[in-house]
Amino acid sequence: MYASAGLVLSGSLLACSAETPAGKVSAVQAAPKLPKGKVSPVAKNLRATLDKLRLQEVLDTAPPGSAQARSLGNPVDKEAQTTTDRARLLAAAPAAKPIVQQPQVDATVLELDRRGRPVSSGTVLMSPAYKNGVAIPVDRNFTAKDVRWRQWDDKGWYANKGQGTIDVVPGREKATVDHMLNYPASVLKLMVNFGVLRLADQGKVKLDETFDYKPDPVSPLCGGATAKTVRQYIDESLTWSSNGASCALVKLLHERGGIDPLNQTFQDFGLQTLQLKGTNPANGGRWSNSITMSSLDTAKLLALVNGAPGKVWTAPNGKPVTSKVLSPASRKLFMSKLGQQGYNDMLSTTNWCGGTYPAPGIPQVTPSRWIGKDGTVTVNASKFGRDVRPCNKKAEVRFSHKTGWVNNTASDAGIVRALPGKGGRTYIVVVFSNLGTQYVDANRPSTPPGIYPFSYTEKFAKLGRAIDTYEKKRRR
């Protein structure tokens, strides 16, 4: 997602089905099968909200067959591309064409009680097969059993109309819904940091030890050798999404024998789509589509990080899953870093306070860490250029979250908690989509020289605001 200056981009080689001309979303579609079971009110609201946003109206700066599409080719280490790549897409924006098919979306809202326990959830999947979105039933353990999850496929999303080929969870061949998971981009760093903090709790890592990161070979994604404390790497990974720090943490997990146990832990907890696989033990890079996360399992992971008393849900083996999976100290550190997120520009857009674009999102407090004397936000040399103090005065919630993007991923996952006297809602929201930096709104303005460019369609901000408005009313 972000390199040292916060401006990186990646790509995927795009192919187009011969049956669907570029610039048109096919109107021909057999009625999709609906999953079995009841869905919650929050799921129904989320589906209706996503449908009303008309995500299919975004423009594609690298449509199939274009020179821009041909220049985006590597589905591995997508975050490793340069500012030149992103500038190329921005330059192509005036000639962008309508997206050729319904975008891919995986969204979950997990409602919490005042003690942090999940009480209801809504998951909606949208794809070329489910153009209006489909609400997914879950069981009492907040598990979606009637979905066949597939790995993201950069070429196949266009060529196969969103149909994946590699299964993520075994034994789901007869599931009603078949859905290709979006590549999670930098939201994968939630799994990485969870794994490192698990090692710290087990005494296999000390947070204040200096870890000498010596990659061999050096990866364009990860950069060269560094020597920092584990605590510092965690801070940089979560607050401003440093790829270098995150690669160091992945390499640390490999060196301390933490990767396989982490993936097994996710399986044991019933978080079957959370898989940190295929990374390179020599440098912590090689981030690819074998790294998977669904919005529902990500929300459940965040529920554990947030903390709740007693059993949060029951694992497949019948054992209770509790917040004791991390120590109180590790959860506090994790939450603190998520609460200092610098990039508040997808579901929440307070970094862009006061402008006509993008639309306002979740009305969060922008962390003071990034606010300069003039009220503008600068995150590791990424300058947003707007005074956020008026939005902070009107803020209603704290949003402890992690964002991510590459050219064909937009992702945001976090915990929303109302400020005192501001409505009392507490919930977790996670959104994954393929509408990354490659896709733009027709009304997107240009940014002044030296200002961080817009990363997402403003439709995600409208989604965040609509979800928060619904949750505020629910708690009245």
Where are these predicted regions, by residue range?
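C-terminal motif of bacterial Sec signal peptides marking the signal peptidase cleavage site
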Residues: S12-A15
